[in-house]
Amino acid sequence: MTGYALNVLALCAAVGATAGAFAIPRIADMLLSRAYLRSYTWWYRCLDDFAHYRDVCPDRLPRQNEKGTAGAVGIWLADCRSQALKGALTHERAEALREAGIDVGKGASTRSEVEQQRRCSFSPWPWQRAVLAAAMALWFAAQPLFGVPWHQGALLCVCGVAMASGVVCDLRARMIPLECCAALLVAGGAYQLLRHGSAGIAEGAVAAAAVLAVCWTANRIARKSGESVGFGDIRCVTALAFACGPATLLGAAACYVSACAFSLAGMLAHRLGRRDGIPMAPFLSIWLAVGTTVLG
């Protein structure tokens, strides 16, 4: 490797480390705050719409397949029930649902609204900055190391920043913000266009549609058990499928094999139960790495 190539690698690593240590914590904190406010506003607006719906139709509940506001409230109601089964509602929201006549059980909530809002912020410890800096230094340096042209590598770096921000948010508050998924979709689509042309866009669209179909089917099967795929995860895997195109299958396999191995290790160590969920964003980042830099 020539001195010029080493200088390029060092520069990319330095830029990545700076982004990881300083930009990503700030981005994650901002996105968490925005996501909480958006979720809070949407949730209580849907609660009001639900009350209005029951006034008009007292003998039935809204369904997801209905049109307009009723369908949106049906989606909200299904999400509330799923969150209640996981014990992920706040005390205030669980009580509001009970007052509205929706039975969510006794173990539907585990924290107050104030605690949830506190979770939707991120002030990193020094070791967390160091981990983010190291991860992003490796990601940025991997682009020239794998021979990715600079303009394609720049797009993958944007994908990496978006994915890392999503990982922080998921670990902190079990959510992957919409903005992270949108950045993955746009930058990943541009990467596919530059690398594979219009065929890459078509393959990415087919992969995204297939992933959406799988998630929809899985949620139809598992919605009564509370083990359905979350909306944030669905948005993220759809964006990843579009970004990875033909490498989606291998990227997804690497992601879920890693997640299964982690869960199995946790159960063997008695740190996880059979029904315990785990944040998926760290494993989705493996999907991005395998599906773009390694195999894309």
Language model features with spans:
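IQ-motif-like calmodulin-binding regions
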Residues: 37-112
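A membrane-topology feature that recognizes alpha-helical transmembrane segments
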Residues: 1-52, 57, 108-296
